[in-house]
């Protein structure tokens, strides 16, 4: 059986073959076994209380039945459930820590289309799970579950001030107010639709909001961080200082400058890392990112005397490296930005606020700030396959990848997707035409080998 958890929890077609109410309940009951033993059980015995879990979701229509299934699984296992409703993923991470909950569930498929959904789990302290804990949850899926009766079953109650707590936390992180910033916010018809406009207004910004009308099916539908076209047009039309686009669960953020140019996660990390260095808050002179970040980021950080540490793709691997090394900024090109002085997870709204604050602190435009790094052209392609491991171990393919990489003044990165049945190809070279040719050639080579198999 294939591993249930991918790079960011469980993600699949909602109510399809995998992500069913039955699976959601089983995962909840298995998680209850894993998280209510050992230290948790002892801590709760001392307090004389049942274990507590926070459950929340993004606005997808399937979130209703998945939250119901997970809440039922937890309560029937003796866990009290605090239902936080529709809030961003990083809000769940914050609230698990802030409310001293034992663990938390976020029902979201992040940037995926509205027909997908997913399950993300946070441990005590609001941290994402390492592989070993995910494996333990999978192990207990078909094992005997906790079955308390009478007064020992859990209660399900509304976490009434969840959003207010998160908003106050975000505002408390700012090193300056952002009065004078005119920002257009694209909420992707997702979880940021409720909280983000209020936060930016409270921080002092003049706010124009778009794509903040979720109906259960329009999340990420041609909007949000993966589709910045409308945001670009609105920034220019409104003569805004900048635009910010989040994804469906608001753990990603990309920006658009006043000229309509996209400022991606790499550029945002570079801007914020330099800001932290100048303000004396950058720990151990290091920024953590993944193998997919542009080589231009390496060059920019080297000029500043900032080390760049790379991990495999997935913000939880970035977070693990940050924790192990004592670093306090990291992220991904896609817009996951982790500022660990304030958050245990990637937080798009937090990153956007701090980007606005840096504009105020420096008095510079986002265009000027983003010029900190020169982006080396990258070309990407996706290859559909149900068996990425076999393809990536194919000797002919490995030889061809090596041959192509030697011909470039850049890199080739090829990896299986952690969330979809795909192999992702990325080719980087100073010459964009050369990168395009190399990527196209490798994509064709993969397809030929698939046809032969």
Curated annotation (Swiss-Prot):
Family recorded in the similarity comment: Belongs to the phosphohexose mutase family.
The keyword Protein transport is assigned to this record: no
Chain sites annotated for binding Mg(2+): 110, 247, 249, 251
Function: Catalyzes the conversion of glucosamine-6-phosphate to glucosamine-1-phosphate.
Name listed for the protein in its UniProt record: Phosphoglucosamine mutase
GO BP term (any one): peptidoglycan biosynthetic process
NCBIfam families xrefs: glmM (TIGR01455)
GO MF: magnesium ion binding; phosphoglucosamine mutase activity; phosphomannomutase activity
Active site: 110
HAMAP family in alphabetical order: GlmM_B (MF_01554_B)
Entries under CDD domains matching the protein: GlmM (cd05802)
Gene name in the database record: glmM
Reactions catalysed: alpha-D-glucosamine 1-phosphate = D-glucosamine 6-phosphate
Enzyme Commission designation: 5.4.2.10
PROSITE patterns referenced in this protein's UniProt entry, alphabetically: PGM_PMM
Post-translational modification remark: Activated by phosphorylation.
Protein's UniProt keywords contain Isomerase: yes
Note accompanying the cofactor annotation: Binds 1 Mg(2+) ion per subunit.
Cofactor(s) essential for the protein: Mg(2+)
Any one of the GO CC terms: cytosol
């Amino acid at each position: 059986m294939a591993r249930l958890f991918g790079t960011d929890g469980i993600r699949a077609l909602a109510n399809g073959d995998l992500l069913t109410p039955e699976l959601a309940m089983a995962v909840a009951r298995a998680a209850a076994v894993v998280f209510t033993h050992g230290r948790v059980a002892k801590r709760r015995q001392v307090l004389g209380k049942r274990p507590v879990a926070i459950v929340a979701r993004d606005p997808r229509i399937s979130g209703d039945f998945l939250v119901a299934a997970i809440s039922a699984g937890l309560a029937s296992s003796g866990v009290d459930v605090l239902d936080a409703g529709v809030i961003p993923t990083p809000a769940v991470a914050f609230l698990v820590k802030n409310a001293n909950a034992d663990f938390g569930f976020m029902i979201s498929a992040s940037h995926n289309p509205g027909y997908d959904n997913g399950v993300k789990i946070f441990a005590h302290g609001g941290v994402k799970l390492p592989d070993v804990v995910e494996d333990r949850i999978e192990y207990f899926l078909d094992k005997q579950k906790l079955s308390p009766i009478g007064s020992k079953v859990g209660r399900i109650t509304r976490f009434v001030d969840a959003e207010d707590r998160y908003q106050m936390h975000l505002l408390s992180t700012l090193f300056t107010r952002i009065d004078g910033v005119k920002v257009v916010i694209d909420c992707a018809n997702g979880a940021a639709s409720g909280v983000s406009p209020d936060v930016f207004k409270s921080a002092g910004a003049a706010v124009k909001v778009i794509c903040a009308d979720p109906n259960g099916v329009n999340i990420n539908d041609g909007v949000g961080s993966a589709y910045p076209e409308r945001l670009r047009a609105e920034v220019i039309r409104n003569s805004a200082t900048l635009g910010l686009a989040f994804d469906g669960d608001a753990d990603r953020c990309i920006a658009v400058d006043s000229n309509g140019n996209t400022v991606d996660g790499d550029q945002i990390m570079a801007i914020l890392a330099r800001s932290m260095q100048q303000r004396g808050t950058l720990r151990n002179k290091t920024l953590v990112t993944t193998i997919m970040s542009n080589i231009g980021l390496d060059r920019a950080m080297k000029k500043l005397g900032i080390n760049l540490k790379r991990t495999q793709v997935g913000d939880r691997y970035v977070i693990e490296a940050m924790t192990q090394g004592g670093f306090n900024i990291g992220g991904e090109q896609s817009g996951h930005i982790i500022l660990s002085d304030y958050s245990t997870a990637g937080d798009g709204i937090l990153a956007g606020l701090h980007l606005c604050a840096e504009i105020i602190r420096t008095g510079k435009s986002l265009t000027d700030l983003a010029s900190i790094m020169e982006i080396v052209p990258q070309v990407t392609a996706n290859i559909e396959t149900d068996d990425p491991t076999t393809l990536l171990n194919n000797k002919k393919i490995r030889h061809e990848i090596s041959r192509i990489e030697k011909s470039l003044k850049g890199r080739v990165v090829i990896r299986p997707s952690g969330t979809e049945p795909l192999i992702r190809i990325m080719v980087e070279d100073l010459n964009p035409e050369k990168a395009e040719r190399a990527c196209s050639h490798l994509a064709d080579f993969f397809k030929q080998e698939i046809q032969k198999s």
